[in-house]
Amino acid sequence: MNHRGIPALFLDRDGVINEEIGYLSRSEQVRWVPGIFSLVRTAQARGYRVVVVTNQAGIARGLYTTEEFETLMDWMRERFLAEGCALDAVYHCPFHPVHGLGSWKQDHVDRKPSPGMLWRAAKDLGLDLAQSVLVGDRCSDIAAARAAGLRQAFLKRGTEPASCPDDAILIDTLAEVQAWLESQPEPR
């Protein structure tokens, strides 16, 4: 699926925007990953839409509700605005194929490594996936980026083995992604 339109910077949430703690559900648990606000400001200045794509198995497992997730994301959006940047859209997958409870137990097309959230964002926002990039911290993030035909994928070291991506760029900090964006020609 290739849409001619606006490029996007897709961000996984846990481990990329905020430190991974396992089933984040409240604002007081948030610890920002260093460099996240600067990265988002740079991406937006260069014409990228910033889109969060996040699996949320905590909803499927009954650890928190969709409403609690949305409240937390509203708070996060306010924090980004206070830092002079914005999250243009947030897509989440509340399903889990094994550990989901009731109707949450399913292998949904939106759950990474499937590219469903990326495809929906492209359709909803008029994005050009072939000019878009993704930053994730798991092999499932990279697989979703590849399946959607994204231009580039970055794997933040720490959560998964460095051998999982095929041609993803391994990074230690978000400043590396920011430098990469700054080195690229302006999107058309």
Describe the residue ranges of each PLM region:
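Short acidic-hydrophobic, aromatic-tinged amphipathic segments that line or gate anion-handling sites
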Residues: I169-E176
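Acidic, Mg2+-coordinating phosphoryl-transfer loop and its flanking beta/alpha structural elements
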Residues: A130-I169
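Active-site neighborhood of HAD-like aspartate-dependent phosphohydrolases
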Residues: N2-V51
